[in-house]
A protein has these predicted regions:
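Polybasic, low-complexity association/targeting segments
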Residues: 1-35
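Domain-scale recognition of functional cores that engage charged ligands
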Residues: 8-10, 29-32, 39-84, 89-372, ...
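Primarily single-stranded nucleic-acid-binding OB-fold modules
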Residues: 341-364, 373-378, 388-393, 400-499
Length: 499
């Protein structure tokens, strides 16, 4: 099946032959659907703290930071913005010249509201000899759209989302990258320093670094802190091999194997290399202007406070187990694991070994928002490989759509996860966990793609906040919808929250 040439290609990527064979086997066997117990809800896996409790959690977080702990804000930022502009690419290629769809009309009717308006106007002047208003008056709408998308214009069709102008301010417009630097200063700084880590695609790395270098000093002065900003790329060793519909390796025209990025689950490797006590994770496009940041900052501190409060208790209990727990202590620890960490033993023997195993693992607290029809992974009580039940974030692809009961759970779930996580990644002795050990490898999924018109099967690794964190202790906290403002299309920037 694999030639000498294949083995060389695999070795260059840092992948073993066993991994490739295991991936090709996964195409044949597929991945099992998850066994669900219930959708999580308030009082069943989701905490909804009142004002007094929120204050306690914020205080707990600030006290924790004051101990000189190392906090890092981790931002997956490798996504290209191309999908944001799908409708505008379609307009440029359409066989009509004036805005026709509702989307196109909205874009051009509100064009002055975009934070990139001035930059686009300047590039139109340069390339077309006319500004946006004059081009529109001439009916030359396509020139405006093309100058936004194409390389000789703003190149927004190719740039990473993190470098597009999102929000207007008196002193100019800001990109999501800049908004994340500001957030880092506001809730993730300790010892007068904010550590921010961006994962960036190889092709955009130099540009991203240059833009960060250009802006970081401004915010460091503004907030009176120092920044330590680091970058990484998805590792080539996390790419997965593609297969033909008959599960044989898909090959490029030159006979080489085709590899594809393994999805955001690959970032567990990047996360594993971060030296931190606590790591905040939030997507690059989920940012708001300064006027709306206080709510985000408050809730970030609340979920971090929940995390360090639970972690402190777990560490205390692990030390008791080390010293030899009495029956009364074992009962107390068992109650903590079942009530606070929402882990149900399901008939397994709840002894010291079981409790240690459930406590001595990475921990995450995830913000969840009420379902308002935004697509996203949901919080569920799910069966683990060992037969116990605990909390997970599930995507629809992990659920058997033929199981009516499960589909009902999924569609009637009250909350979803907007990728808003705070993670504790060291054990009670202060040593870092090896995060890849806590991945549930059976939670990848297979999708259908094509290359040069040929159908292929692609293998996605267990998602970063799904199967890659399957064996972590997980707790959910309800956060307000105002803390979640993703930008999936360019017109989302016209929503009030981004103005």
């Amino acid at each position: 099946m694999l030639s000498q040439q294949d083995l060389q290609q695999i070795a260059q990527k840092g992948i073993s032959q066993e991994q490739i064979e295991s991936q090709l086997n996964e195409f044949k066997t597929g991945f099992p659907f998850l066994k669900l117990e219930a959708a999580a809800g308030i009082g069943r896996g989701i905490i909804a703290p009142d004002a007094a409790e929120r204050k306690q959690y914020e205080d707990a977080w600030n006290a924790y930071k004051a101990e000189g702990k190392r906090v890092v804000k981790f931002v997956p930022a490798s996504g290209a913005a191309s999908r944001m502009f799908k409708n505008m690419f379609a307009f440029v290629d359409a066989d009509y010249d004036v805005p026709t769809t509702d989307f196109e009309k909205k874009y051009f009717d509100s064009i002055e509201k975009f934070a990139f308006y001035d930059a686009l106007d300047a590039i139109c002047q340069k390339n077309e000899g006319k500004g946006i208003k004059a081009l529109i008056a001439d009916g030359n709408y396509k020139a405006v759209a093309a100058n936004m998308l194409k390389a000789e214009g703003l190149n927004y069709g190719q740039l990473p989302k993190g470098l597009l102008l999102f929000h207007k301010y008196e002193d100019g417009a800001r990109t999501p990258m800049e908004e994340h630097l500001v957030e880092g200063a506001l809730y993730a700084a300790s010892n007068g320093e904010a550590h921010v880590h961006f994962t960036v695609s190889h092709e955009h790395m130099e540009l991203f670094k240059a833009k960060v270098a250009e802006k970081a000093d401004t915010f460091a002065k503004k907030y009176g802190i120092k920044y330590d900003i680091t970058f990484s790329e998805q590792k080539p060793s996390t790419d997965t091999v593609a297969a033909n519909p008959d599960n044989t390796p898909f090959r490029n025209d030159d006979g080489s194997l085709l590899f594809r990025p393994g999805g955001h689950g690959a970032l567990i490797e990047n996360l594993n290399e971060i030296d931190a006590d606590v790591i905040f994770i939030k997507n690059i496009d989920n940012v708001v202007p300064d006027r709306l940041k206080p709510e985000t900052v408050e809730w970030k501190q609340v979920i971090a406070g929940v995390l360090v409060t639970l972690q402190k208790k777990a560490f205390e209990y692990l030390r008791i187990l080390d010293a030899g727990a009495t029956d009364a202590q074992l009962a107390e620890i068992a109650e903590f694991v079942s009530k606070c960490l929402c882990t149900d033993a399901k008939g397994k023997k709840v002894d010291a070994a079981y409790l240690r195993e459930k406590l001595n693992r990475p921990m995450r607290v995830c913000g969840v928002v009420k379902n308002v029809g935004e697509p996203g992974g949901g919080p569920f009580l799910t069966y683990n490989q060992d037969g116990t039940v605990s909390l997970q974030i599930l995507e629809s692809s992990q659920i058997d759509t033929n199981n009516e009961e499960y589909m009902k759970m999924f569609t009637q779930g009250t909350h979803f996860n907007p990728v808003d996580l705070v993670c504790a990644v060291k054990n009670y002795k202060g040593e870092p966990f090896n995060l890849p050990e806590f991945v549930d490898k059976t939670t990848g999924f297979i999708s259908s793609k094509s290359k040069a018109g040929k159908e292929l099967k692609a293998l996605e690794l267990p998602g970063l906040w799904n199967g890659a964190m399957s064996n972590w202790s997980t707790v959910f906290v309800e956060v307000p919808l105002g803390t979640f403002n993703p930008v999936k299309t360019v017109n989302d920037l016209l929503r009030d929250q981004h103005q």
